[in-house]
Amino acid sequence: MSEVIEKAKRAKQASFKMALSTTDDKNEALQLISQAIINHKQEILTANALDIEEGKKKGLSEAVIDRIRLNEERLQDIADAILQVTILTDPIGEALEIIEKDNGLFITKKRVPIGVIGMVYEARPNVTVDAASLAIKTGNSVVLRGSSSAIESNKALIQVIHQSLASSSIPKEAVQLIEDTRREVANQFFQLNEYLDVLIPRGGKQLIDTVIKQSTVPVIETGAGNCHVYLDESAKVEMATEIVLNAKLQRPSVCNAIESLIIHRQWFEDHGLELLKTMQSHDIKIHGDSVVMEKFPPAIKAVERDWEKEYLSSEISVKIVDSVSEAIDHINRYGTRHSEAIITENKMNAEQFQLQVDAAAVYHNASTRFTDGFEFGYGAEIGISTQKLHARGPMGLEALTSTKFVISGSGQIRE
C-alpha cells in the first residue's frame, strides 16, 4: 500500500474517533501543540534553515524564500494563532434548527465535522500548523501535502504535533503529512474519494488550477490574489498613498497584497506623478499603461499579462480609467475574486463598487491586507475561498463543518 493511501486510511479511521472528542479534549491538545512549538523552536528553525539553503541552491525567488522562512517571531505568531483558536467557540454540536412535528418527532439540524480534509499547499510551513489546529478544533482529520520546498520544516512541525497529540486525548493519526512530494503522488492524492471528503488547495494559480482539473474529490477553491486598489476621483491623497504602500509593501508575497493599482484620470492628473514618485522611492517597479508612460517615463510599458499577473514582489501594474464603472469592469475581468478596495469620499461610488465587484472581500478606504482569518477574528485560517458555494472569504471554523439531521422519536412510523 502506498504512503498516500495508508496515511489517508489512518486519517479516515481517526475521524470516527474525532467525532467523539469534546471541546476540552480539543483545546487541551491545541494548548500542548502551541507550547511545544515554542519549546522545540530550535529543531524547527534548524529544519527550516535546510529548506532555505536548498531553495537558494535551486534559485528560488526571494518572494518564495520569504514564504518558506521561519524565525522566532513567526513561530511565536504561529503559537499565538493556535491559542486564539482555543478561545473560539466550538461550532460542533451547535443546534442550527429544531423542529417538533405533530407526531412527536424531534428533528434537530446539527453542525458536525466534515470528516477528512485534504490540504494541498505550496511553500508556507505555517499552513501545516494552521490546517492542523483548525481541523482538530472542528473534530476533523486532515491529510497534508505540502511543497518539496518546505518539506523539512513540515516534517519537523508534524513531529512536534504528533508528540503533543500523543499526550492528549486526540488521536495523532488525525493529522497526517504526505512526505513524498513527487507529482504522481499528488495526482493520486487528488483522487482519494474513498478517504477524503474535501480537498482544499492553497497556493498560486497554477497549483489551484491543477487541483481543480485533476481532482475527483470535491474542491473548495482558494484563489490566487490578483488584488486591486482603485483610487476614485475624490480619494484623499494622504490616505490613498498610505493604503497603496501598505497594501503593496507590508508583505508583498502574500495573497492579500495588491498587484494592480487603478486610478481615476482626474485624480491621476492632479496627484498621480507625486504618487508614482513616492512608489518609486520605495523601490516599487511600476508597469504602466500608455497614460502612465506618458507622464512617468521610468515606468515599464504594461502588456496584457501584467493585468492578470500575481507578482508576489515589489512590482505593480497601474491603469488609468475614466469612471468607477470602468474600474469595476477591469477588476471583474482580471481579478481573482479575492480582495478589492476603493478609496473614495463618494458614498454612491463606494456602494456601487461594493455591490458590483465580484470578490470575497471588498474594502472602502482600507488596505486589502486585512483579509485574513486572524484579522477577521477567526483565529488561524485554512485558506481564503474565492468561490461562492459552501464557503467564501477567510475560512475559519464554521467553514470546516457540515450539517446532520438528528431525529428522535418514540416509535413513530410513516403511514
Swiss-Prot record:
Extract one GO BP annotation from the record: L-proline biosynthetic process
Q: What is its EC number?
A: 1.2.1.41
Catalyzed reactions per annotation? L-glutamate 5-semialdehyde + phosphate + NADP(+) = L-glutamyl 5-phosphate + NADPH + H(+)
**Pfam families attached to this UniProt entry:** Aldedh (PF00171)
Question: Which subcellular locations apply to this protein?
Answer: Cytoplasm
Name this polypeptide is given: Gamma-glutamyl phosphate reductase
Keyword terms: Amino-acid biosynthesis, Cytoplasm, NADP, Oxidoreductase, Proline biosynthesis
Instruction: State the protein's purpose.
Output: Catalyzes the NADPH-dependent reduction of L-glutamate 5-phosphate into L-glutamate 5-semialdehyde and phosphate. The product spontaneously undergoes cyclization to form 1-pyrroline-5-carboxylate.
Which InterPro entries did the record assign? Answer: Ald_DH/histidinol_DH (IPR016161), Ald_DH_C (IPR016163), Ald_DH_N (IPR016162), Aldehyde_DH_dom (IPR015590), G-glutamylP_reductase_CS (IPR020593), Glu-5-SA_DH (IPR012134), GPR_dom (IPR000965)
Entry's Gene Ontology cellular component terms:
cytoplasm
Instruction: List the source organism.
Output: Oceanobacillus iheyensis (strain DSM 14371 / CIP 107618 / JCM 11309 / KCTC 3954 / HTE831)
Q: Select a single GO molecular function from the record's annotations and give it.
A: NADP binding
Pathway given for this chain reads: Amino-acid biosynthesis; L-proline biosynthesis; L-glutamate 5-semialdehyde from L-glutamate: step 2/2
Q: Which gene encodes it?
A: proA
CDD domains from the xrefs?
A: ALDH_F18-19_ProA-GPR
